[in-house]
Amino acid sequence: VDAFNETRSNGCLVLLSPIIKAPMAWNELIASWNVAPATNAVLEIQARGIYPDHETKFYTMGVWSSDRLARHSVGGQRDDDGRVKVDTLLTARAGADIQLRLTWSGAAAFPPVKFLGLSLLDNRATPETSPSQRAAWGKTIATPERSQHSYPQEEGWCSPTSLSMVLTRWSDLLHRPELNLDVPEVAQDVLDTNFGTGNWPFNTAFAGSFEGMRGYVARLSDISELENWIAAGIPVIISAPWHLLSPGRQATGAGHLTVCIGFTETGDVVINDPATNFQKGQQVRRIYKRQDVIKAWQESRNTVYLIYPETIPPDPFGHWDSQK
């Protein structure tokens, strides 16, 4: 954000980006951000499309704060140019460049934005399938196991439960006890008061609010990219409806978040599934058929949460942040 134009008015700090040349003809956009917690500070993240013949309005991608009562998505954003579905901007026409506007309010001082990312997708395209990355086959990453159903107050806590597992993995590896958070605490810290705990960039923003940690939403091309992360020793949260993870079931429209922790010797997927009922003898760690995971994951257009210390594996395709 160093190149953003900065203005101050009525206690607000407004950061306006230069026009960002899109690398592809996108029609779906998800914004991600990482900022340190700041008492009373509220950050509104907005994006608009810039076409050769006109500009769209600024759409609000989220209102973020460490104060749960001030943190929310914005509904009712629909016009001829596009609409916002909770955390995703869908445009009626592909091919826009992008401009971002960040507005801080509510405090005397504001923390720096330490990371800002955009995930762009052309939902009309069918990416070519890449060869399997067999270095990940037979590898499983030790990751704590937790169930959303262990908490009587839970309401669709698959996302914060998955996030709790991954953060605790990094807590153990980095010897950082502040990352070992129980599920209810994570649920409160990612809550979108208008939607619940499944707002994708709210989950990654919370993970990235910790010093030295990065978190953001990405869309991958196929399972080979997921294998790259597992081969690098990094568990990945994937958006894949639970009812499609087993064969013979039909889509219902309900989403689900799970943690991919590895692959079997034959390429099936090892998952920590938060939708586990211990009273029924179920286990968090499960093996799902490769093709079932691919089918379920495609429902979210291969959406993932990438959460790691601020170092990552090489990116051969330019689909994630590869700056060291």
Where do the protein language model's features map onto the residues?
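Active-site-adjacent structural segments surrounding the nucleophilic cysteine of cysteine proteases
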Residues: T103-W200, W242, A251-G253, W320-Q323
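Noncatalytic regulatory segments and standalone regulatory/sensor domains
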Residues: V1, L13, K21-M24, N40, ...
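Histidine-centered active-site/metal-ligand motif
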Residues: A41, C158, H256
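A short beta-strand element within beta-rich, extracytoplasmic domains
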Residues: M24-P37, L100-L102, W242
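Extracellular beta-rich ligand/substrate-recognition surface
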Residues: D2-C12, Y216-S221
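Short, surface-exposed tryptophan/glycine-enriched loops
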Residues: G75-G95, N228
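Short linear interaction motifs
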Residues: S9-V14, A25, D80-R83
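Conserved active-site-adjacent core of cysteine acyl-enzyme catalytic domains
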Residues: S17, P177-Q323
